[in-house]
């Protein structure tokens, strides 16, 4: 049985990671029995980017969980697709948790603060891992989970996790029978362990950055969204992060309350819709109608729990 790995996934977005140990970080599961296959029962064909199961059982279903590189930052890809950008260099995500990247990022932050003395609020967008956002070959959104942790993994991070919890990481902790631990699932102990580990590690690195910002006499603001996995503001670890303020996109009343109810920050800001993007601001578009609808859906939430500031975002 041959299972092609990249079918239905944008090759602009991802690349199979066959550099790190496949036997350790990949998993082939017989979904009919629920049991993982021994690593000796399958192999990877790099030429076709496929996993080959040598002796599959008749009528059984099999899945492959594998590591992949994000070779185009999904938010940048989203913006490029929505705005129909042409000939734009693809921005790549990088793992700030890696020691060399960690040191480089802190140095760049200090350089920015020293060269921008007129800035009094530094807005981070965000810290450091993106939610799950996958595109298919036609650049359509294939799977989106604003709370998904699947893009926050690397062998470096997973090895640290194993040392802390004392047991072997399995891809299935995140894959979750194909449900990817979406918010309608009851999380397993292992997945909650991984979330808690990520929050602690992210909060510690956030505190390093906010301490630097404060040392230069400036406030640290966080955008609620995008690369926000591990810094969920209602979890206890966030209170140790040193963030002064929150700004987030207002889709409706519930997302406004998600911003305005955040405890422990000096002020909150809502970014109302529409974004100033060409998908709304174009010949025949009606941004006024969208703005009114957004306001009507959010205003009752403001009465119940006000935000401190209102703004808009985007670029044309």
PLM segments and residue spans:
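Polysaccharide-binding and catalytic clefts of secreted carbohydrate-active enzymes
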Residues: 1-240
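Hydrophobic targeting/anchoring helices
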Residues: 110, 123-127, 132-134, 184-185, ...
């Amino acid at each position: 049985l041959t299972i092609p790995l990249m079918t239905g996934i944008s090759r602009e977005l991802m690349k199979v990671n066959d550099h790190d140990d496949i036997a350790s970080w990949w998993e082939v599961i017989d979904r009919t029995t629920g049991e993982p296959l021994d690593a000796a029962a399958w192999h990877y064909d790099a030429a076709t980017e496929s996993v080959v199961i040598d002796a599959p059982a008749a009528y059984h279903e099999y899945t492959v969980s594998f590591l992949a590189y994000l070779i185009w930052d999904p938010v940048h890809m989203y913006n490029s697709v929505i705005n129909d950008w042409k000939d734009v260099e693809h921005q790549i995500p990088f793992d700030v948790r890696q020691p060399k990247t960690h040191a480089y990022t802190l140095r760049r932050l200090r350089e920015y603060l020293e060269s921008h003395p007129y800035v009094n609020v530094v807005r981070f967008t965000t810290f450091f891992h993106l939610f799950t956002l996958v595109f298919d070959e036609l650049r359509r959104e294939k799977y989106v989970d604003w709370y998904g942790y699947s893009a926050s993994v690397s062998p470096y991070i997973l090895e640290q996790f194993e040392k802390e919890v004392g047991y072997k990481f399995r891809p299935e902790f995140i894959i979750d029978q194909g449900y990817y631990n979406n918010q309608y699932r009851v999380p397993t102990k292992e997945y909650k362990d991984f979330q808690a580990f990520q929050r602690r590690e992210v909060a510690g690195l956030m505190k390093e950055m906010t301490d630097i910002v404060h040392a230069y006499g400036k406030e640290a603001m966080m955008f609620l969204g995008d690369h926000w996995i591990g810094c969920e503001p209602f979890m206890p670890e966030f209170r140790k992060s040193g963030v002064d303020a929150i700004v987030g996109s207002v889709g409706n009343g519930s997302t406004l309350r998600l911003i305005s109810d955040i405890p422990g920050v000096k002020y909150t800001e809502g970014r109302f819709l529409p974004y100033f993007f060409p998908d709304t601001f174009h010949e025949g578009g009606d941004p006024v109608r969208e703005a009114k609808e957004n306001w009507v859906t959010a205003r009752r939430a403001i009465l119940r729990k006000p935000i401190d500031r209102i703004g808009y975002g985007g670029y044309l």
